[in-house]
């Protein structure tokens, strides 16, 4: 690759590092033995108030294509006609170019691209660390001036373009970071391909590690690095940057004698409920016998990196965890002043007091479900929905499909667009907050039955596609998957358009069908009212 513009990257890196730090995401990587149907999963809730809303299909590029390496190529960018039209937005900078050495894979492109036509899927969680602690200051000094040319957006794009398996993606991304360097905050990238699930953590400079998720286990991360063990000479299960220990010793990050723990060495993270409490509720949902303590400081350092679930999981199970706001615990965000009289879990103020997995600022949620028993064209399934998980839906997308409905490529946050998929859900989300306790029942009535049917339908459609592919009718199979996916996406768009009308009619001004008498406030609100302002219902 050409490095003529790398000097520019370093000059501007300090300004750009903060851009990715906006994100605040929760991810799961699920081994095939931990799921009911033997699929692997890689998930991502893209939680931010500034992320791009749109999703595109990036077509395969033939061998010999000139490919740009772009830093921060998301804000205001337009990939609708990429690569014929290269619009990298207001911040995007081309720092390098290379020539493709293979026909690249088609993939689903978003703020963080997530699925290709081979069934390789990934997500990410930006990792914070304590920059003011003694270890944090050493980390800052160690990585200062070592900014490279790859950020997380570009690394995921290029891996999906060029890799077919999770292991290949780990090796490919690791080689790029080793040679060309990292530019951005530390990241935790979860990856799966139907056979294996991996976690790839990159900390800065040329330093990274990757661990395979045991087949019977699940990994979860919430904005902090979590690979808390180190294994040498086992590349089938653990890989890392060359000279990683030497780098740690030379920069005073490790004494060379104690246990070498990558996440605490390169991304030191003190007890902070913002992240640890999300991980706690997720892991306890998967295995209640873990007996993890969400309050005692520093015990989270000993939390398991991987959890074997008490019961094998489904997509619905993971979706339910994404909708969690600490119900049934002392941290329930609806049982606070921010929950209001109707138990609203989506008040923006709650993120600063009790950060839940379910968040008002979730741009989109994706749950990749990849089953290696199916042909590539049929296995590359990802479940997608815009907005807060508790009120959104999931619709099936395939990395192999040949088109997307128009509403996927529309929408910006500042301008209401009734034809945008994100805005379509955002209206429902906002209206549900008027009287959440009642409105969520309307959401469930419109959504849950359809999703149950859809899970079964999609599995059946995949089997039909597999049969067609087995008969040599691959184009026919892909056309069927495309038509089915687009039909479901349009169905959900119409359903939520109608649901918005229902919510507005039912709960305008907090009433129920225009009736303000007999409104049911939460017990918390009634008790608060009685103690602070006198009983008022």
Regions found by a protein language model. Give the residues of each.
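Substrate-recognition/cap regions that form aromatic- and gly/pro-loop-enriched pockets
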Residues: 339-471
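Bacterial N-terminal signal peptides that target proteins for export
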Residues: 1-9
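A contiguous strand-loop segment
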Residues: 25-152, 172-305, 309-313
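Glycine-rich, aromatic-lined ligand/substrate-binding cores of catalytic
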Residues: 247-381, 385
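Histidine-centered catalytic/metal-binding microenvironments
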Residues: 446-537
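Short, well-ordered beta-strand elements within core beta-sheets of diverse protein domains
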Residues: 156-162
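Hydrophobic core
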Residues: 12-20
């Amino acid at each position: 690759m050409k490095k003529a513009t790398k000097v520019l990257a370093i000059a501007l890196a300090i300004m750009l590092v903060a851009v990715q730090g906006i994100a605040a995401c929760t991810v799961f990587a699920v081994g095939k033995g931990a799921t009911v149907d033997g699929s692997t999963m890689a998930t991502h809730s893209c939680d931010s108030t500034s992320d791009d809303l749109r999703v595109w299909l990036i077509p395969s590029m033939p061998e010999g294509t000139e490919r740009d390496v772009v830093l921060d190529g998301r804000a205001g960018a337009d990939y609708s006609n990429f690569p014929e039209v290269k619009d990298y937005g207001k911040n995007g900078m081309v720092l390098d170019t290379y020539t493709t050495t293979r026909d690249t894979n088609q993939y689903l492109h978003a703020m963080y691209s997530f699925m290709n036509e081979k069934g390789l899927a990934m997500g990410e969680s930006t990792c914070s660390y304590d920059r003011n602690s003694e270890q944090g200051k050493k980390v800052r000094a160690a990585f200062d001036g070592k900014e490279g040319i790859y950020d997380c957006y570009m690394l995921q794009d290029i891996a999906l373009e060029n890799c077919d398996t999770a292991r290949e993606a780990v090796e490919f991304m690791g080689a790029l970071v080793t040679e060309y360097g990292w530019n951005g905050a530390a990241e935790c990238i979860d990856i799966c391909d139907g056979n294996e699930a991996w976690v790839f953590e990159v900390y800065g400079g040329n330093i990274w590690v990757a661990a395979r998720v045991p087949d019977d286990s699940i990994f979860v991360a919430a904005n902090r690095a979590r690979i808390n063990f180190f294994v040498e000479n086992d590349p089938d299960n653990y890989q890392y940057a060359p000279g990683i220990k030497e780098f740690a010793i030379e920069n005073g990050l490790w004494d060379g004698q104690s246990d070498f723990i990558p996440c605490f060495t390169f991304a030191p993270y003190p007890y902070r409920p913002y992240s640890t409490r999300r991980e706690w509720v997720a892991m306890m949902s998967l295995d209640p016998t873990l007996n993890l303590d969400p309050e005692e400081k520093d015990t989270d350092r000993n939390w398991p990196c991987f959890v074997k679930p008490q019961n094998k999981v489904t997509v619905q199970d993971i979706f339910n965890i994404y909708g969690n706001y600490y119900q049934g615990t002392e941290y329930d965000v609806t049982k606070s002043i921010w929950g209001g009289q109707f138990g609203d879990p989506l008040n923006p103020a709650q993120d600063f007091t009790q950060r839940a997995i379910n968040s008002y600022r979730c741009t989109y949620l994706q749950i990749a479900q990849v089953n290696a028993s199916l042909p590539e064209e049929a296995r590359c399934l990802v479940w997608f929905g815009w907005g807060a998980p508790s009120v959104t839906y999931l619709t099936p997308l395939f990395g192999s499909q040949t088109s997307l409905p128009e509403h996927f490529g529309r929408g910006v946050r500042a301008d209401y667009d009734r034809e945008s998929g994100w805005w379509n859900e955002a209206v429902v989300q906002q209206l549900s907050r008027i009287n959440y306790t009642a409105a969520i029942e309307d959401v469930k009535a419109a959504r849950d039955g359809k999703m149950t049917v859809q899970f079964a339908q999609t599995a059946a459609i995949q089997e039909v596609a597999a049969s067609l592919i087995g008969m040599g009718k691959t184009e026919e199979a892909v056309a069927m998957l495309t038509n089915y996916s687009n039909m479901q996406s349009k169905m959900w768009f119409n359903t939520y358009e109608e649901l918005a009308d229902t919510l507005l009619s039912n709960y305008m001004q907090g009433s129920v069908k225009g009736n303000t008498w007999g409104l049911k406030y939460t017990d918390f609100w009634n008790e608060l009212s009685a103690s602070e302002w006198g009983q008022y219902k």
